Amino acid sequence: MSKSVFPPTAEAAAGAHVSSLDQYRELYDRSINDPEGFWAEHAQRLHWFEPWHTLREWDYHKAEIGWFLGGKLNACYNCVDRHVEDGHGDDTALIWEGNDPEESRTYTYRELQAEVQRAANALKALGIGKGDRVCIYMQMIPELSIAMLACTRIGAVHSIVFGAFSADSLVTRINDSECKAIITQDTGVRGTKLDIPMKANADLAVQSTPSVEKILVVKRTGSEVTMSEGRDVWWHEACEAADAECPAEPMDAEDPLFILYTSGSTGKPKGVLHTTGGYLTYAATTHHYICLLYTSPSPRDSS
């Protein structure tokens, strides 16, 4: 194994939140010896509608643990709204580049907030609410991020399924989490071809998934697809018809945020449930120490 060491550039080191191995070890030691103080401090990077009354409770015999009990927050609000309210609405929030580099889209925080609120209201109009599970079966397009944020805004639990998986793979994951709706796209792109049958796969899947009531379809390629009246809805039409404002739902720290399934390569896929407060705190902490996206400290370094 190579023992080569590649030090960071002086510019990167100057902007780092951990400037030495000794500082990293100090952080690690504190996380082990004072976990409550460590994580309470890092949780303050988030916006909380209500503070927690108990940092953590656990019972290792029952394999039960809870963090930030009593605290209320919202993932979408933390990722989008607070940056708008802090005066950064015109800053870039999302950059998307398609299969063809000439195809790209950029969203500011304010633009993303507007898109997400309409999408959230579109979901609510279709009967989706807090605690309902939504399967998101799309490629890496802007609407994927918007759909995730829209679900978290209203308290729905999203479950992302890889966009190249088959109808059978969809069935397994949808039935396990009893998804109420699917968000997908007409067809998927691979190279110069537009023939990944994503909507067709969703149509096949719903024949064996009794919990699904609605399919929301993004018009990605413009390919002709079958739309079932009363069940299938075009994404753009639903969002255009939706109200412009949708307040973020305050969620308990231990409320489910999303379900991510294991690959299933060694057996039936297992759904891993991530809860709101703990996931956001860890993600914000990791981002703060690892993702140097700016050349100088930024108020958005925890999003």
Q: What are these model-predicted stretches?
A:
Residues 155:
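Structured binding elements
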Residues 116-117, 272-292:
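Conserved structural elements of the adenylate-forming
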Residues 105-110, 249-250, 257-281, 303:
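Conserved AMP-binding A3 loop
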Residues 101, 184-253, 283:
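ANL superfamily adenylate-forming
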Residues 138, 159-175, 186-195:
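ATP-dependent adenylate-forming carboxylate-activation enzymes
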Residues 76, 94-149, 166, 170-171, ...:
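Conserved AMP-binding/adenylate-forming core of the ANL superfamily
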Residues 262, 294-301:
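Conserved small/polar residues in nucleotide/adenosyl-binding loops
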Residues 1-107, 111-114, 118, 124, ...:
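N-lobe entry segment of adenylate-forming
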